[in-house]
Structures are given as structure tokens and as C-alpha cells.
């Protein structure tokens, strides 16, 4: 069944937290339908039936197997951004989540308004990580070999999107220029940030522009 209204999938097996998060997201984003899942299997079914615009994912649901479940959901719906929402706030867990393809990491301890802003950032195509959980060593600057190798993995379409981002164009304008949906552009932006190892659109644009000027 097709739905015209965009949707956010909340996948968490703790009913009280899931209900509280659903209320937060519903109040912050009334234009989105809220879909719920309480296991890896039900999350897969929801991805297939609801085609959500974002997944807020608990790694410890039944059937997840931790990061293995994140990887399988990432493979199942590669165009859908997935944000891990977790009570485990260690930097190593954050790093592993991003390495496995998460578009963000949201601690369950964050205040309500901060969670809403984190969701907004990810829906806009950014990668969200709280400042205090970011690695202290700056990553993915333009002259960093990791940044260059990440840039080399971008698809031709992702490079076009990045070039238009450098030109200062919004997702809406990029979608018009490339004759694709805005949701497709957001998925490309999330993939670009993930591959370049950066956490914001601005960081991607500045670093890529510097690298391209020096090449």
C-alpha cells in the first residue's frame, strides 16, 4: 500500500521509551506518520510496507545481534537513513555505528528538544553525533588520505550532488536540477557524509571544495 505522507520508523523493544520517543517525534514533526517496531523482524516488515524516510533504531532489540542487525537493515534499505538511538554512549560504540552505515547517533539521555533537533538534522541530510561523543582527533580534512579515499568511492551521481552542494544549492534545488526526488537527494547527502567521514554538510562542502581546488 502506498502512502503519500512521509513516515518515521521507531524501532525499540522498550514500550515506555518507544511511546515517549513517538510522542516527541510526533509533536516535533506532525507532518510525519509514526511507525513502530519492536524487533529486527518487525523493523524489516515496516521498511517494506511503510517505506519510511528515517529509522530510529535501538541496537538491542530481539533479533538484532547488535551491529549485525544495523548492517542487515542498512543493506535491506540502502536509501533510508538509519540513526542509532542508544543508552550506550561510549565513543567506540558511536564510531562503530557510523562505520556500519548509521546516519547519526542519538543518546537516549539527551533532552527532548535536543532529540528533536537531532532528528531534524538527519532528515535534512546531515550526520548527527553529539559534540561530547565526537572523536577528539579531527577527521576527514581535505588533505587527509582517508578523505581522498572516501571521495574516490562516491558514485557519479553522488559526485554531482556534492558539486551542487559546493555551489550552495539546497536539496530542493538539487532535486530539481537532477530530476530526482528530494528524498533521493537526502539519501545521497547522507551517503556522501558517511563515505567522506564527516558529520555535517558544511564540513563536507568546505573539505571537498579545498581538495578539488588543490587537485
Q: Can you say where each PLM-predicted feature lies in the sequence?
A:
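Two-component/phosphorelay signaling modules centered on CheY-like receiver
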Residues: 15-35
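Receiver (REC) domain active-site loop signature in two-component systems and cognate sites
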Residues: 61
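Acidic catalytic/metal-coordinating carboxylates
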Residues: 39, 64-68
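Short, flexible helix-to-coil linker/hinge segments that flank and couple to helix-turn-helix
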Residues: 94-99, 104-152, 213
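Recognition helix of helix-turn-helix DNA-binding domains
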Residues: 168-203
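Active-site residues of response regulator receiver
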Residues: 58, 86
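Acidic, metal-coordinating helix/loop segments flanking the phosphotransfer/catalytic sites
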Residues: 36-54
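Short amphipathic alpha-helix used as the core "switch/output" element in two-component signaling
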Residues: 45, 67-79
Amino acid at each position: 500500500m502506498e502512502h503519500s505522507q512521509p513516515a518515521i520508523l521507531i524501532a525499540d523493544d522498550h514500550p515506555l521509551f518507544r511511546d515517549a520517543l513517538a510522542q516527541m517525534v510526533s509533536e516535533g514533526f506532525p507532518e510525519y506518520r509514526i511507525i513502530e517496531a519492536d524487533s529486527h523482524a518487525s523493523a524489516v516488515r515496516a521498511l517494506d510496507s511503510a517505506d519510511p524516510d528515517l529509522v530510529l533504531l535501538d541496537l538491542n532489540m530481539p533479533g538484532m545481534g547488535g551491529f549485525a542487525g544495523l548492517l542487515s537493515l542498512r543493506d535491506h534499505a540502502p536509501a533510508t537513513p538509519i540513526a542509532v538511538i542508544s543508552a550506550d554512549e561510549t565513543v567506540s560504540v558511536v564510531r562503530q555505528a557510523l562505520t556500519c552505515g548509521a546516519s547519526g547517533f542519538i543518546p537516549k539521555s539527551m533532552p527532548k528538544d535536543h532529540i528533536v533537533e537531532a532528528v531534524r538534522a538527519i532528515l535534512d541530510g546531515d550526520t548527527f553525533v553529539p559534540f561530547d561523543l565526537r572523536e577528539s582527533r579531527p577527521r576527514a580534512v581535505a588533505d587527509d588520505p582517508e578523505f581522498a579515499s572516501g571521495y574516490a568511492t562516491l558514485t557519479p551521481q553522488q559526485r554531482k550532488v556534492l558539486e551542487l552542494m559546493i555551489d550552495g544549492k539546497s536539496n530542493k534545488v538539487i532535486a530539481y536540477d537532477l530530476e530526482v526526488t528530494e528524498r533521493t537527494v537526502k539519501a545521497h547527502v547522507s551517503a556522501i557524509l558517511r563515505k567522506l567521514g564527516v558529520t555535517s554538510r558544511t564540513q563536507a562542502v568546505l573539505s571537498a571544495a579545498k581538495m578539488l581546488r588543490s587537485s
